[in-house]
Amino acid sequence: MTQEKRNLHKAPPDGGWGWMIVIGCFFVTVCTRAVTRCISIFFVEFQSYFAQDYARTAWIHSIVDCSTMLCAPIGSYVSNHFSCQVGIILGGVLASTGLVLSSFATSLEYLYLTLGVLTGLGFALCYSPAIAMVGKYFEKRKALAYGIAMSGSGIGTFILAPVVQLLIEQFSWRGALLILGGFVSNLCVCGALMRPITLKEDSLHYPLKQEQMENEPTQSGRLDSSCSPLCQDCSHKRLCYCTKKEYSFLLKPKFMVLAVSFLFLAYGCSPPFVYLVPYALNVGVSNQEAAFLMSILGIIDIVGNITFGWVTDTRFLKKHRYCCYLIAVGLDGLCCLFLPILTRFQLLVPFSVMFGYFDGAYVALIPVVTGDVVGTSSLSSALGVVFFLHAVPYLVSPPIAGWLVDTTGDYTAAFLLSGFSMIFCAVLLALAKIINRIKKRPKAVAVPTSDIKQEIWTNGDVSCANAINQKEV
């Protein structure tokens, strides 16, 4: 009881242990998103070893991303009903096990199950709960906190990309996966940092006090059989009410538009990460230079995370986060449209810089914009839904892009489709913003003509009109 009172806050503390939460979330994104990105470095190795085409090999990366996003609501459920610590530690065990088992793969189908499903499920149990915890600890500096936390994806990619390439060269792809499995087990340590916090806003959804529940202890969480049917019925209704309240944001028009836009965003953002290295190798870039492109993308991703988070926390831009987000998405899509004409390493470097910056910018704002729409109390559940919506696009976009590469013989169609998808996402959000602004304009109040008598005076040059309420005459 004392611990619960100590952890009950009227508002997010905006500091204190919150910075440890940011550090924990930072390493969660390193071990989940950065490792997922680095799986694309194994692409050529898998394709060569198993003698498969682009489309079949691309399913590995797709299934990892899809499993991570598809199972995100499970991560939110475990976080909401048990604790964030339990979810992340369990996820760390599953993800590490999946990577270790993948090192013994004998076929692509084996990798689909271990590297794809099992590792993806582990990442799902870690990712959304860790991100939601940052939102519970920060309000005024939320975008900056998220920028630092989400920069783990970029920093991790910058460091891990050349390291993974070196591990493959020294120990083969099997040894590299085994070492990555040990590295990902650090998610269990990150989970231990996630100290629970209860906000006053959250406690309003659970009106029964702890003392009231302690007076009548129950076994196994069940009501005693001597309880009246009315008591049991009230308990059931309260559970249903809490569940409905937890997901009431699904009916908000703003969230619906945001949800649809995520489908196009998720489709567009995945292929560039999967096919940047194979594309670079295809145009004559060396293995180390191709891996270095991913490192550049990763380090600039960090700059985008932190600078965009800091800038959008300023007084002037704080109320325009939504617009900053859609601009970043649109510019990221525009970068993809130019990628097919960049055929030298010197030209691919600027692409990695621009694409990485805007990718980091909008990724840092996804939980912020979502929180602005649904509120802090529903953020964990909302992020579960948001990442769930990423699942199908993440699953189908790399194989579709791979099919386009196999069919056309180059990467042009794949990158153009990716770019236009992200641009459409930005256009959709912009249209929704414009329509919402038009609806908010104050409407003129019509005055009944039956109660008004109009008198007009004129001097020949200027006419004056005066409305007199007949009821007062």
From Swiss-Prot:
Keywords: Cell membrane, Membrane, Transmembrane, Transmembrane helix. The keyword Membrane applies. GO terms for cellular component: basolateral plasma membrane; plasma membrane. One of its GO terms (molecular function) is uniporter activity. InterPro entries: MFS, MFS_dom, MFS_trans_sf, Proton-linked_MCT. It catalyses: creatine(in) = creatine(out); guanidinoacetate(in) = guanidinoacetate(out). It comes from the Eukaryota. It is found in: Cell membrane; Basolateral cell membrane. Gene3D superfamilies: MFS general substrate transporter like domains. It is a multi-pass membrane protein. GO terms for biological process: creatine transmembrane transport; creatinine metabolic process. Residues 1-10, 436-473 are cytoplasmic. The chain crosses the membrane at residues 11-31, 58-78, 86-106, 115-135, 148-168, 177-197, 257-277, 291-311, 322-342, 349-369, 385-405, 415-435. Functions as a transporter for creatine and as well for its precursor guanidinoacetate. Transport of creatine and GAA is independent of resting membrane potential and extracellular Na(+), Cl(-), or pH. Contributes to the process of creatine biosynthesis and distribution. Belongs to the major facilitator superfamily. Monocarboxylate porter (TC 2.A.1.13) family. This is Monocarboxylate transporter 12. It comes from Xenopus tropicalis (Western clawed frog). The lineage of its organism: Eukaryota, Metazoa, Chordata, Craniata, Vertebrata. The gene is slc16a12.
